Amino acid sequence: VAKEQELTLREGVYMYFPGPQFETPAEVRAARVLGADAVGMSTVPEAIAAAHCGYEILGVTLCANMAAGVLPQPLSGEEVNEMAEQSAPHFSSLILGCLERL
């Protein structure tokens, strides 16, 4: 589906941080040492709940910002919201395309 829609997907190790605050630069460095390619506050709780219910799961996460300490500017919730809004049509199309093939 992603190829048909000319979307770039990446596979990697996702490390969950519970939030609600952004991860710190030190946590990001530790996650990198432990092999994480991305960090975030979503996907994992939903996957745990679904697995607990006996569902088969596929985790797909939109990485909406660079992790703390990667770029010189501080993280911003506004930045995350803007990226999510910009990506929503493509992300929705990807998910709907996958669901149509089940």
Language-model regions, residue ranges each:
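Glycine-rich phosphate- or other oxyanion-binding loops that anchor nucleotides, phosphorylated ligands
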Residues: 1-62, 66, 78-102
